[in-house]
Amino acid sequence: MNLPFNISQNELSDLLLNISVERPVFIWGAPGIGKSALVQKFADDVGLECVSLLGSQLAPEDIIGIPKIDGETSCFMPPKMIAKKEPYVLFLDELNACSQEVQKAFYSLIHERRIGEYHLPEGSVVIGAGNRSQDGAIVKTMSTALINRMFHVQLVANTNQWLDWAYNEGIHPWITDYITQRPDHLFSEPPKTEEPYSTPRSWHMLSDAIKSYSAGDKPISDNILRVLAYGSVSPNHAGQFLAFVKNIGNKNLLNDIIKGEARFPSEPKDRDVLYFVAQSFRSRLLMELPNDKKMLNQNTQQLAHRAKAMIRDLAHINIEIAQMVVSDDDNKSLPEWFMIEIVRDLPRLIAKNR
């Protein structure tokens, strides 16, 4: 499923508080963006126990229970983890990864909040979650009957909200500082090949690994840090993260270059740092320069003016990296008006610098 509108982490918390008490909610989203953690946090916030069932590992009898003979009749005894006396949050994770038979077993539980003769305690909440088919995850077609029994939302990662959470949770400062500079690296679409990719979960995993090594007597070696980074996040992001850590003593380098107080690193040994700073420069331009030139304010006008000279300086150091700053990448391109000015002004800037 691909819904036309998305919600952030904070919006999901508000939505669950207002909707899930009345109707079951299904959360769609890519792997690793925090669906399970947000449901657990919601349960904690409302003071309810959270019981998680993993749809991909369930059989129908795990839900409806087993029959019990009572005189001349029988009834199904629901499993203990579901049949509770106090209200709770029932979280059906990977619901769209279970078989059609299991989906059918969930019908009455989701729609009527009952299994056979057992009814969920008053005040209980039912929430489902699952990955999307375009994410390369193992999913099955969800029946229309099941879809129609739930309210659907699509969750996306929000960098600012994740950083707020990360600071409170003690995520390693290398990670938070890096994502602050490269917010576009918090999440990357799942790749077609079998390799790690960046998600809030994988950055959290990298943070835990770095903190585990840092707790020892010896500082973490460059080789081990390289292994940890490339084993956790997207290869491109891992390489730039390593360059960022290498330059950690001057994490404000890009701002200093923009202000004219520093220059791009030009030594061959600093080529990885140059690439990271150039990528950060491109990301800054994409985020801050408006598509319509009429929307420029004083700050963005100064940035655009300074950016032309910076691209000229980059071209003197490494033409390929300078081209990377202005080229189309992942369907993202710099504003057309800015590119026209680059083509118009760059020869003059180069001649002036000779």
Residues covered by each model-derived region:
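Alpha-helical lid/collar subdomain of P-loop NTPases
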Residues: N168-I319
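Serine/threonine-rich low-complexity intrinsically disordered regions
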Residues: S8, P78, S221, N250, ...
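AAA+ P-loop NTPase catalytic core and its hallmark functional loops
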Residues: M1-Q181
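Conserved short hydrophobic patches within well-ordered secondary structure
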Residues: F106-I110, Y275-V277, F281, I321-V326
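Context-gated lysine
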Residues: N2, K35, K41, K68, ...
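Detector for Asparagine
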Residues: N2, N6, N10, N18, ...
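Long, positively charged, glycine-interspersed low-complexity recognition regions
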Residues: Q298-R354
